[in-house]
Amino acid sequence: TMALHLLPEPKDLMLVKGMCALDQEMSIVLPAASGDASWFAARELRKEVLRATGMALPIVKEQAPPRPDHAILLVCGPEQAEAFALDPSHKRLDAAGEQREQAYVLAVQRGRIVLYADTPAGLFYAVQTLRQLVRLHRDHIPALIIRDWPSLEARGLLLDISRRKVPTMDTLKHLIDELSHYKLNVLQLYTEHTFAFPSHPRIGAGCGSLGSEDILELDAYCRQRHVELMPNLQSFGHARNILRLPEYRHLAETGLRWTLSPAVEDTYTLLGDLYGDMLPFFSSPTLNVDCDETYDLGQGASSAMVDELGGVGQVYMQHVLRVRELAARHGKRIQIWGDMLLNHPELIAGVPGDVMLLAWSYDPAESHPGVGELSGVGAGLWVCPGTGSWNSLFPRISGARVNIRNMVREGMAAGAVGMLNTDWGDFGHYQHMGLSWHGYILGAAQGWTGGTTSDEAFDAAFGPLFFGEEHPAIMEALDLLAHTNDLPGVQGINRSNTVLALFDDPLVGETVEGDEALPAETLREMHSLASQAAATCEALSPEHQRELTLREMASAADMIAHAALKTALGQRIRATLRKVAPGEPPSELDEQILALDKLAAGLEGLREEWELLWHARARISEIHVALGFFASTHTRLRIAAAWLEEQRRALAAGESADAELETYNASDHRVLWQIWPD
């Protein structure tokens, strides 16, 4: 039997003998009564056939049952099925209840293909599956019958657009095209400040904010592809981008300027204004108000409320109820993250019946107890795993595989209705977006199948479908890069020390000396894996259909290799200084000074390519944050070289070297998570 690698894997696929040859006689046939959605899906299919075979199939509408062969029928709903006299087996959707809404049948026979669904969304998904068959088999499609439906009704992606990087409109549309092709049906853009609020223009100024017309355009683009663009506006903690502005400082709970204080009535005036500026542009009935990680709640302005209401949890819940009211004025129900409820479990039972709970964890654990604890209350539970791309130069794929699969499985067991895969941008969003395609599509696949897709089956399908030509070599490079995160000493919680090694101080950084220092063997292996991957991606990227993604992989690989060299050099310099005696400075010191200068020049080249790749997908936004890491690291390399030159001179003059680096000052060099919280 031939293995058919489709993503997501269909629930029920039966191969039959023979195949369907696509030829010039073929047309795409719609019932006369079909609407815009069928016409859109038909054009998507035609584009795919044209790309794969060079044939442009006509799209026609017919009143009566069409001829039995040379036709691809797109049929939506029982009335159209009757008009086209469909065989009963071709309209048998085995799905029940809510899942029927997105179910479809795809029957490929000799000379004829039938796509049937009850709804436009189901028909759109049938077309996506057929597009994959065309991509893989071109003009000879294997005969089969597929009956398919999703395990989870809502399958979404949350993309962080507030940690200093806002994608261009073209990038967002490309993202929506890709996500909807793999049957994702929800998109949230995580927003702290990156929206142009007419009533508070300074909040979103100068950071690449999306405007209201951008939202109208994206909302329509999403609806056409059966994606719900859900508004997302952080409404409690994570408010530093607002609270740093002088005119809003009085709203802060504490001097940390992190949480909007529920003790200040102006907090609710502000949120009411922001909701009024933003929510009317979204057709979705649901707003994610976030409200996670309110670290300092109850420790400042609201401390009296804590005594009055009987605990921080009660203060938290009262705020949630107030934002729920504000959202309701705009006809929206709310979603909230569940972490604060898990910290105050006594609140869970009192969650109102129209509030959706989001259980998040990015941990590659076998079980996530929060999923069960948050189930059975409110308006339904969504599970929220992550792509593992943030706090890392390349995504922590092996962790993301386990995290996504297990969160979805536990969600299914707990009766969850949705999955929201997350792609965060902590500390400057320096990781390239294209590195997350694997994680985005993995989330879509597991959400559809209920977490039953194996890693091997996923990769076997993802390579050919996403990368196309040269996919075996590209997937091998992807594995090599993923493996750099699994080497001894590299993993932290939700982060990877490859990126710390890149931006750390070259002589006293955490990855160079001390408990967090990376072992020499790890650094050698890191350099070897990354160099091999870089060579593959650089060789294959020109003219490839995924050229940009391959350049992003090469850039990440080059940065990982550079980080390994830099850290190993720092460790060698420290070792040299410990063993030199006054008198003749060893020649290796000269080599090490030159090597630091060479690394500084190399870092400039890496930054240049990194910056080009940022602009290829994103607005300028707040690129200065990540550029600051490159600039200060470059400065540290120069300072280290100059300081080492002083040690060389001291040795030549018969003095001792400063083996303990007491005269080397790096205390003001703080990068990444050393600048917590973000």
Per-segment meaning from a language model:
Residues 2-25, 29-32, 39-42, 66-68, ...:
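Substrate-binding groove of N-acetylhexosamine-processing glycoside hydrolases
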Residues 2-155, 406, 413, 418, ...:
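Contiguous, structured surface segment used for ligand recognition
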Residues 36-38, 115, 166-167, 298, ...:
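A generic structural signal for short coil/turn motifs at secondary-structure boundaries
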Residues 59-61, 231, 336, 383:
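A structural preference for short, hydrophobic beta-strand core positions in alpha/beta folds
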Residues 92-106, 200, 206-215, 397-398:
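Aromatic/His-enriched, Gly/Pro-containing loop or helix-boundary segments
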Residues 144-162, 251, 382-391:
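N-terminal small/glycine-rich loop or linker at the start of catalytic domains
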Residues 152-338, 349-350, 356-358, 367, ...:
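Substrate-binding cleft of carbohydrate-active enzyme catalytic domains
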